[in-house]
Amino acid sequence: MKEYSTKDIRNVVLIGSAKSGKTTLSEAMLFEGKVIARRGTVEDKNTVSDNEEIEKINQRSIFATPLYAEFMNTKFNVIDAPGSDDFIGGAVSAFKVCENGILVINAQQGVEVGTDIFARYADKYKLPLIVAVNQLDSEKADWEKTIAEMKETFGHKPIIVQFPVNPGPSFDGFIDVLKMKYYHFKDDNGTREDLDIPANLMDEAETLRQELIEKAAEFDDTLMERFFENGSLTEDEIREGLGKGIRQGGVLPIFCLSGKKDIGVKRLMEFTIKTAISPAETKFVTKDGNEVECNAGNPTSIFIYKTDVEPHLGEVSYFKVMSGHLTEGMDLENAETGDKERLSAIYAVAGAKKEKVSGLQAGEIGCTVKLRAGKTNVTLSQLGSGIAYEYIVFPASKYRCAIKAESQNDETKLGEALSKISAQDPTIIVEYSKELKQTILSGQGEQHINVCKWRLENEFGVKVVMFAPKIPYRETITKVATATYRHKKQSGGAGQFGEVSILICPIVEGVPFTNKFKIDGKDVVLNVKTKEEFDLEWGGRLEFYNCVVGGAIDARFMPAILKGLNDKMTEGPLTGSYARDIRVFVYDGKMHPVDSNEISFILAARNAFKEAFRNAGPKIMEPIYNVEIMTPADYMGACMSDLQNKRALIEGMSSDKGFSVLKARVPLAELYRYSTTLSSLTSGAATFTMEFADYQPVPADVQTKLLAEYAAQEKEEE
């Protein structure tokens, strides 16, 4: 493969809902670029893009796969991104390295929730889009409905460049109002006839052409003047105006195609090459806020957007050349570690195929192998240049489960395997919770986690069990209570003795501090000698006040008392959960000149706290999440009813671009496998986000149940 200059490169990500036909479209693009002589199909499990075994088993894209074709003297790099919300991380990483997107819409389904989600991501990353209405050869293809939904969702941006002739099983061509031609296809291999527009379609073509001209003129004052002067624009002028509109995010040009029959694919590629953005037009923002122009004259830098482990190659780092000219054997500096990395081999990538190349210009996408620290989000740059690019920010997790090896002997092996998988897929989060004493695996949905399980068992040979994780409850109090506890132990020689009297009260936001209380029926003012305040790592506060007078307890034992309190804060008296938002006053006690020591006061403080806590109106608190659901309106009732059964507090409903949006506060305990539940309720048509909000007291019946479960567990462990 020859080296292409930056201006002759186009980087395009294919995005859209699952089953919109992106992989089939990518296969047709490779066929048009003569990369392959015969197109594969998802059903036959022989596409270039879906080359991983798990993708063949599921017959869907799971990973974002880089591909390329050499077409019209241009390097046409394509990343086929997964359409399922569960695998959104692959699409997000592709947004970082592509200047253009093709939004693929299934003509049978029209604009789906997933369509809107991907369009929003593209808008967030300022990624210009071209729209490809695919599967126009399908029995239920509905062009008019799809266009109407696009206008409802995207407002004034959609503009028709092509419209189909005979949509449905007999679909064999379209009218292109930019070219003012009728493109007729004689077979399923993209063989095209360029014909005059039939008389019965000319009025529609001329109307749409005029709309296209007016839209193109909107984005350039000079073109607007020409339009007013001449009443029309040339094909090149229309393309120029559309190009500016695409760059400004103000227009969505709509194309017709059937990826399966290779109808319209070549024309889509032609338009993309002539109109879309080349890397030479772009600048990339570094961590320190500077901009680096994507050209060969700047210091060489690459950004790693994806990592993988592949048979016979080991660890593979996929990158974009952000600036400069990358050559085989070049030494670059790792922006994270400062270490030098040598790129002993570089490759152009088309699915599983890696073609070794001697160099890649700025703007190119490629891969290398066996870097020491070539992880996702790492910048490698010319020695001394100091270039480090902003990280990809991946979406928050929406699914969590606990995981353990089937055999305890495999726990170490499991940990190593999970570490490798999470390095390859940053949307897989693995953490060991000291609080829950469980390994928690988080991802985008149950399908995402199931793929992780498949990889663990088939690629790493570790059989695993996945199950509902424990909930990180919190414990607190609602009123004042006191307790005195004496720890005394005699066993010959020096014994143990420590007595502590404490008062505890809740810390409530907005309620001022007080040191006036009623103890044993008497009004008492506790004089504070010293105080310590702690922001707890699990949330909330602990305030510790030494109010002991008359030398009842030496100051040297106060740290031991505080340690005893902290011990019980990390293992609350009700369910063993972390305690929070408690103010503790140590106001009296006793000590022994010989037997008192640190351990005595640690134990006395722990037991005094436990006793006082149980008398202070103790409450269990649960984590609450803000949940936002986007769904077709037909499913709103089912979604709301389901949430109400999950103890949710509905906060609002609204309409957004043709979809219904439901906002609610939901206990985490009710959200296990919610992505699966929502998919079942809506036939996979809805999506949701969840974000931690705060902690709230559980209802009385839930607290009773949790206390009983904890008591049974304690008894079982005795």
Question: What are the residue ranges of the model-derived segments?
Answer:
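Structural and coupling elements of P-loop NTPases
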Residues: 1-718
